[in-house]
Amino acid sequence: MRFAASIAVALPVIHAASAQGFPPPVKGVTVVKSKFDENVKITYKENDICETTQGVRSFTGHVHLPPDNDDFGVYRNYSINTFFWFFEAREDPKNAPLSIWLNGGPGSSSMIGLFQENGPCWVNEDSKSTTNNSFSWNNKVNMLYIDQPNQVGFSYDVPTNITYSTINDTISVADFSNGVPAQNLSTLVGTGSSQNPWATANNTVNAARSIWHFAQVWFQEFPEHKPNNNKISIWTESYGGRYGPSFASYFQEQNEKIKNHTITEEGEMHILNLDTLGIINGCIDLMFQAESYAEFPYNNTYGIKAYTKEKRDAILHDIHRPDGCFDKVTKCREAAKEGDPHFYSNNATVNTICADANSACDKYLMDPFQETNLGYYDIAHPLQDPFPPPFYKGFLSQSSVLSDMGSPVNFSQYAQAVGKSFHGVGDYARPDVRGFTGDIAYLLESGVKVALVYGDRDYICNWFGGEQVSLGLNYTGTQDFHRAKYADVKVNSSYVGGVVRQHGNFSFTRVFEAGHEVPGYQPETALKIFERIMFNKDISTGEIDIAQKPDYGTTGTESTFHIKNDIPPSPEPTCYLLSADGTCTPEQLNAIKDGTAVVENYIIKSPAASKGNPPPTTTSSPTAAPTAGSAMLKAPVAMLAISALTVLAFFL
């Protein structure tokens, strides 16, 4: 990895006292200096911003790592200030296991998962208040949400003055030495990271190295977490299909080095006792999943015909033809194996080859879908998709919330610097040391539970591709997993939430009526799956102890494609100022730009948007829904949005 010789001196940061929009000065934080390194520290505050259950504690804070030599001997000339939000379990936190939650991107904040999916609260439509989530994942598990790599979400290198464009969702470094410009609907001011793409990890493996150093500090020195249960799990989503396998396998490798005394440095010898890796709608490996981008829009269980047969076949041709997607990815991986075997991304030739593969696959796979005007994260929704609701962005913009959190920077959902850094080296086309499917196999051989969970309406990391990954793994239990069949996921006495193939510690689950962010669509189903896996129960019923019956396998049907779904009603459009590029019509964007829009609690009331057209089908109505149980459970109202995809590896 190459780092800039220096980082520009940060502009003086103007605080809330002099300009609206900036975070207030940080006060009342607890500072814990590392007993291993005087330059390392943790700062944090206890608060009840989201978790309001009596007696249940939660903490927001940062782990601060100074500039230092990286693991491969190159000087890292920037600080890493990694944000965390820790929620104790609502039940028996001292004896509860702990799970890390990571969203993907690369560059997406884990506040997406916290507020739109599985955290203790939902943010209401007013963007100011919250509602308790009874299906929160911290009901029985201690949850640690982390913004990573550096500059993502509330994580930062150096606080820097910025402007934010609501029209195109972009952040720019600003010079306010001559005064702060007036804010309007299209331009806001605040404090963020440097936006320097050299001041963050530039690939998945380097992100794994960084998060391991964070974990060494947090698990040894954060004083508010002293559990009797030392098990650690990682649950992740989307680009987390790469983060999860790479991070977990790196943790496991480091554990082995600590045990055999290869690692002997004081402060870096804490065993991270891995229990589970969970991946929700993960984009894991292009070579397994690329074909699904052609097939899923053409032939899915909702009867949606987004592609013609001719279009599907043309995309498959572009995947397989000479110098097509697969050819370029193969060349990238061969070049990386030869020229960048340790995955530092410091070989310019390899970076160019892999970035070209990344861009080519994006062109062949993603560009055609843009023409459908359907949702990347929910094929049954329009492209301008208001679900899950983006109200948490306004909530996290409140001065009182930022003060209670002790954050010196404003929130940003997506870190442009991280995206540029990863895309510039072609990270999505690359493998890591074993390949990400090889990582999953390694973890299974090491006794770690692995769960793949996919909502069946997601396009961007769809369940067709996820199933191919599950069947393509090569480990000692491969044949047993293939012999297992699909069984119902029984959520309660009246509702079946999906189907699962499971053998022992490995499972693949298709969740009905869910898009990319499964817990946001099906909170009860997602919670049942999560808790059953975490507590060693079978996913189908929750009644069989997998630890006692390690050879357990599901029985049922070989395939699930015969289970068809109804297309849901189109969600009511909601143009949200802080997600304008993904939730607003061109007319509304123009009104925001010229200042004529009527806005209430970040929602554009005028001009109003019309409801989108239903997705195309071959029949007047699809076949019956998969269950006769109760209607699906949803989070209260309705999505975050990102810019139209311009690169393949731009996921949540």
Swiss-Prot record:
InterPro entries listed in its UniProt record: AB_hydrolase_fold (IPR029058), Peptidase_S10 (IPR001563), Ser_caboxypep_ser_AS (IPR018202)
Catalytic center residues: S238, D458, H516
First and last residue of the signal peptide: 1-19
One GO MF term attached to the UniProt entry: serine-type carboxypeptidase activity
Subcellular location: Cell membrane
Single Gene Ontology BP annotation: proteolysis
Primary role: Extracellular serine carboxypeptidase that contributes to pathogenicity.
Protein name from the UniProt record: Carboxypeptidase S1 homolog A
Organism whose genome encodes this protein: Trichophyton rubrum
